[in-house]
Amino acid sequence: MHFKIVISLLALTGLVACHTPELVLDPSLSAGAMPVKGRNGLQIGQVIRYGDYTTDKVRRGWTKGYDIPFILRFQGAKEKLSFAQFGPENTKATVACISKFKSTEIELVRDFFGIQLDYQNYFAGNITVDQGGANWDFILHNPNGDFLREKASAGFIRNGEQQIAIEAIRGLKGQPDWMKELTVYGHEFRIDNAVVGAVSTINKGTVWIDERLDAETRTVIAAVATGLLLRRDMEDVDMQVTR
Protein backbone atom coordinates (compact mmCIF):
# COMPACT_ATOMS: atom_id res chain seq x y z
CA MET A 1 0.00 0.00 0.00
CA HIS A 2 2.79 2.45 0.95
CA PHE A 3 4.67 1.66 -2.28
CA LYS A 4 1.54 2.50 -4.29
CA ILE A 5 1.10 5.78 -2.45
CA VAL A 6 4.74 6.74 -3.10
CA ILE A 7 4.35 6.09 -6.83
CA SER A 8 1.16 8.14 -6.96
CA LEU A 9 2.76 11.04 -5.09
CA LEU A 10 5.85 11.01 -7.28
CA ALA A 11 3.71 11.03 -10.41
CA LEU A 12 1.59 13.91 -9.15
CA THR A 13 4.65 15.81 -7.90
CA GLY A 14 6.26 15.55 -11.32
CA LEU A 15 3.14 16.92 -12.95
CA VAL A 16 2.82 19.78 -10.44
CA ALA A 17 6.45 20.76 -11.07
CA CYS A 18 5.49 21.53 -14.66
CA HIS A 19 2.21 23.40 -14.08
CA THR A 20 -0.80 23.60 -11.80
CA PRO A 21 -2.70 20.30 -12.12
CA GLU A 22 -6.19 20.51 -13.60
CA LEU A 23 -8.93 17.90 -13.74
CA VAL A 24 -10.07 16.43 -17.01
CA LEU A 25 -13.72 17.53 -16.91
CA ASP A 26 -16.54 16.22 -19.04
CA PRO A 27 -16.84 18.78 -21.89
CA SER A 28 -20.63 18.78 -21.51
CA LEU A 29 -20.40 20.40 -18.06
CA SER A 30 -21.74 23.95 -18.28
CA ALA A 31 -20.26 25.67 -15.23
CA GLY A 32 -17.50 28.07 -14.31
CA ALA A 33 -14.66 27.12 -11.97
CA MET A 34 -15.04 28.30 -8.36
CA PRO A 35 -11.71 28.22 -6.46
CA VAL A 36 -12.09 27.11 -2.84
CA LYS A 37 -11.04 29.26 0.11
CA GLY A 38 -10.57 27.97 3.64
CA ARG A 39 -9.65 24.36 2.98
CA ASN A 40 -6.04 24.65 4.10
CA GLY A 41 -4.95 25.92 7.49
CA LEU A 42 -6.34 25.57 10.99
CA GLN A 43 -9.44 23.43 11.48
CA ILE A 44 -10.63 25.57 14.40
CA GLY A 45 -13.27 27.97 13.13
CA GLN A 46 -12.86 26.63 9.60
CA VAL A 47 -15.22 28.08 6.97
CA ILE A 48 -15.31 26.88 3.34
CA ARG A 49 -16.13 29.39 0.57
CA TYR A 50 -16.37 29.22 -3.22
CA GLY A 51 -18.42 31.34 -5.61
CA ASP A 52 -21.82 32.13 -4.07
CA TYR A 53 -21.48 29.21 -1.64
CA THR A 54 -20.23 29.30 1.93
CA THR A 55 -20.52 27.39 5.19
CA ASP A 56 -20.72 28.39 8.80
CA LYS A 57 -17.94 27.18 11.11
CA VAL A 58 -17.31 23.48 10.51
CA ARG A 59 -17.83 21.23 13.52
CA ARG A 60 -15.88 18.00 13.86
CA GLY A 61 -17.53 15.41 16.06
CA TRP A 62 -21.14 15.64 17.21
CA THR A 63 -22.40 18.34 19.45
CA LYS A 64 -25.76 17.99 21.16
CA GLY A 65 -29.05 18.24 19.34
CA TYR A 66 -28.62 15.69 16.55
CA ASP A 67 -31.82 13.67 16.33
CA ILE A 68 -31.73 12.89 12.59
CA PRO A 69 -32.51 9.16 12.22
CA PHE A 70 -29.55 8.69 9.88
CA ILE A 71 -27.16 10.09 12.46
CA LEU A 72 -28.60 8.13 15.35
CA ARG A 73 -27.92 4.88 13.51
CA PHE A 74 -24.17 5.47 13.29
CA GLN A 75 -22.99 6.92 16.59
CA GLY A 76 -19.85 4.76 16.56
CA ALA A 77 -18.31 6.31 13.43
CA LYS A 78 -14.83 7.72 14.09
CA GLU A 79 -14.98 10.71 11.75
CA LYS A 80 -17.91 13.14 11.92
CA LEU A 81 -18.42 16.54 10.33
CA SER A 82 -21.33 18.96 10.50
CA PHE A 83 -21.90 22.39 9.01
CA ALA A 84 -24.53 24.64 7.46
CA GLN A 85 -24.22 25.02 3.70
CA PHE A 86 -25.46 28.32 2.27
CA GLY A 87 -26.32 28.53 -1.42
CA PRO A 88 -28.11 30.70 -3.99
CA GLU A 89 -31.43 32.43 -3.31
CA ASN A 90 -30.79 32.33 0.46
CA THR A 91 -30.96 28.53 0.48
CA LYS A 92 -29.58 26.90 3.60
CA ALA A 93 -28.97 23.22 4.32
CA THR A 94 -27.87 21.49 7.51
CA VAL A 95 -25.24 18.88 6.69
CA ALA A 96 -23.89 15.93 8.68
CA CYS A 97 -21.14 13.69 7.26
CA ILE A 98 -19.81 10.40 8.62
CA SER A 99 -16.92 8.12 7.71
CA LYS A 100 -14.70 5.48 9.31
CA PHE A 101 -17.67 3.42 10.44
CA LYS A 102 -17.30 0.76 13.09
CA SER A 103 -17.14 -2.72 11.60
CA THR A 104 -20.43 -3.54 13.32
CA GLU A 105 -22.12 -0.64 11.49
CA ILE A 106 -21.03 -1.53 7.95
CA GLU A 107 -24.01 -3.81 7.38
CA LEU A 108 -26.33 -1.08 8.70
CA VAL A 109 -24.89 1.30 6.09
CA ARG A 110 -25.55 -1.18 3.30
CA ASP A 111 -29.08 -1.86 4.51
CA PHE A 112 -29.89 1.85 4.89
CA PHE A 113 -28.83 2.64 1.32
CA GLY A 114 -29.72 -0.70 -0.25
CA ILE A 115 -26.12 -1.27 -1.34
CA GLN A 116 -24.96 -4.71 -2.43
CA LEU A 117 -21.27 -3.89 -2.87
CA ASP A 118 -19.08 -5.24 -0.09
CA TYR A 119 -16.73 -2.30 0.41
CA GLN A 120 -15.50 -1.49 3.90
CA ASN A 121 -14.85 2.22 3.30
CA TYR A 122 -17.79 4.61 3.02
CA PHE A 123 -18.35 8.36 3.25
CA ALA A 124 -22.01 9.13 3.91
CA GLY A 125 -24.29 11.77 5.33
CA ASN A 126 -27.55 13.64 5.53
CA ILE A 127 -28.59 17.01 4.09
CA THR A 128 -31.68 18.77 5.41
CA VAL A 129 -32.76 21.76 3.35
CA ASP A 130 -34.44 24.50 5.39
CA GLN A 131 -37.80 26.17 4.72
CA GLY A 132 -39.69 23.14 3.51
CA GLY A 133 -36.94 21.65 1.39
CA ALA A 134 -36.34 17.94 0.98
CA ASN A 135 -34.32 15.63 3.20
CA TRP A 136 -31.40 14.10 1.29
CA ASP A 137 -29.01 11.25 2.08
CA PHE A 138 -25.74 10.58 0.28
CA ILE A 139 -23.13 7.85 0.19
CA LEU A 140 -19.83 7.36 -1.60
CA HIS A 141 -18.09 4.01 -1.41
CA ASN A 142 -14.31 3.80 -1.52
CA PRO A 143 -13.97 7.62 -1.69
CA ASN A 144 -10.20 7.53 -2.20
CA GLY A 145 -10.55 5.24 -5.19
CA ASP A 146 -7.56 2.95 -5.44
CA PHE A 147 -4.33 2.48 -7.28
CA LEU A 148 -4.76 1.26 -10.88
CA ARG A 149 -8.57 1.17 -10.61
CA GLU A 150 -8.51 -1.97 -8.49
CA LYS A 151 -11.68 -0.72 -6.83
CA ALA A 152 -14.13 1.89 -8.05
CA SER A 153 -15.26 5.06 -6.28
CA ALA A 154 -18.90 5.93 -6.83
CA GLY A 155 -22.10 6.77 -5.01
CA PHE A 156 -25.24 8.87 -5.08
CA ILE A 157 -27.33 11.57 -3.41
CA ARG A 158 -31.06 10.91 -3.06
CA ASN A 159 -34.23 12.36 -1.58
CA GLY A 160 -36.76 9.63 -2.35
CA GLU A 161 -37.79 11.18 -5.67
CA GLN A 162 -34.56 12.38 -7.25
CA GLN A 163 -31.13 10.78 -7.40
CA ILE A 164 -27.82 12.42 -8.30
CA ALA A 165 -25.00 10.05 -9.24
CA ILE A 166 -21.45 10.59 -7.98
CA GLU A 167 -18.56 9.29 -10.09
CA ALA A 168 -14.79 9.50 -9.66
CA ILE A 169 -12.55 11.69 -11.81
CA ARG A 170 -9.11 10.16 -12.29
CA GLY A 171 -7.51 12.12 -15.11
CA LEU A 172 -5.45 15.32 -15.02
CA LYS A 173 -4.79 17.47 -18.06
CA GLY A 174 -1.47 16.65 -19.69
CA GLN A 175 -1.17 13.22 -18.12
CA PRO A 176 -0.27 10.20 -20.21
CA ASP A 177 -3.04 7.61 -20.19
CA TRP A 178 -1.23 5.25 -17.82
CA MET A 179 -1.03 7.95 -15.14
CA LYS A 180 -4.79 8.47 -15.29
CA GLU A 181 -5.16 5.08 -13.62
CA LEU A 182 -3.28 6.05 -10.47
CA THR A 183 -5.72 7.74 -8.14
CA VAL A 184 -8.89 9.82 -7.70
CA TYR A 185 -8.48 13.60 -8.01
CA GLY A 186 -12.12 14.57 -7.63
CA HIS A 187 -15.72 13.58 -8.33
CA GLU A 188 -18.45 14.62 -10.75
CA PHE A 189 -22.19 14.80 -10.20
CA ARG A 190 -24.70 13.51 -12.77
CA ILE A 191 -28.48 13.83 -13.16
CA ASP A 192 -29.97 11.49 -15.78
CA ASN A 193 -26.39 10.87 -16.94
CA ALA A 194 -25.81 14.58 -17.64
CA VAL A 195 -22.84 16.11 -15.77
CA VAL A 196 -24.12 19.00 -13.64
CA GLY A 197 -21.23 19.54 -11.23
CA ALA A 198 -17.75 18.51 -10.17
CA VAL A 199 -15.28 18.94 -7.33
CA SER A 200 -11.50 18.83 -7.49
CA THR A 201 -9.77 17.82 -4.26
CA ILE A 202 -6.32 18.78 -5.56
CA ASN A 203 -4.48 21.42 -3.52
CA LYS A 204 -6.94 24.07 -2.27
CA GLY A 205 -9.80 22.60 -4.31
CA THR A 206 -12.17 23.80 -7.03
CA VAL A 207 -15.93 23.34 -7.49
CA TRP A 208 -18.17 23.55 -10.58
CA ILE A 209 -22.00 23.63 -10.38
CA ASP A 210 -24.37 24.16 -13.32
CA GLU A 211 -26.27 27.40 -12.64
CA ARG A 212 -29.28 26.16 -14.61
CA LEU A 213 -30.22 23.84 -11.74
CA ASP A 214 -32.72 24.99 -9.14
CA ALA A 215 -31.34 26.56 -5.96
CA GLU A 216 -32.01 23.51 -3.76
CA THR A 217 -30.25 21.07 -6.09
CA ARG A 218 -27.27 23.39 -6.44
CA THR A 219 -27.01 23.74 -2.67
CA VAL A 220 -27.25 19.97 -2.17
CA ILE A 221 -24.45 19.36 -4.67
CA ALA A 222 -22.40 22.06 -2.94
CA ALA A 223 -22.99 20.38 0.43
CA VAL A 224 -21.54 17.07 -0.79
CA ALA A 225 -18.69 18.83 -2.59
CA THR A 226 -17.85 20.66 0.63
CA GLY A 227 -17.99 17.40 2.58
CA LEU A 228 -15.53 15.80 0.17
CA LEU A 229 -13.19 18.79 0.49
CA LEU A 230 -13.31 18.53 4.28
CA ARG A 231 -12.94 14.78 4.51
CA ARG A 232 -9.65 13.85 6.12
CA ASP A 233 -7.11 11.63 4.46
CA MET A 234 -8.32 8.08 4.97
CA GLU A 235 -5.44 6.14 3.45
CA ASP A 236 -5.05 4.34 6.75
CA VAL A 237 -8.52 2.83 6.43
CA ASP A 238 -8.77 -0.72 5.18
CA MET A 239 -10.18 -0.32 1.68
CA GLN A 240 -10.11 -3.98 0.78
CA VAL A 241 -13.25 -5.61 -0.56
CA THR A 242 -14.52 -8.28 1.81
CA ARG A 243 -14.25 -11.75 0.47
Model-based region annotation:
Residues 19-243:
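Intrinsically disordered, low-complexity proline/glycine-rich segments
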Residues 1-7:
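Bacterial N-terminal signal peptides that target proteins for export
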Residues 14-17:
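C-terminal motif of bacterial Sec signal peptides marking the signal peptidase cleavage site
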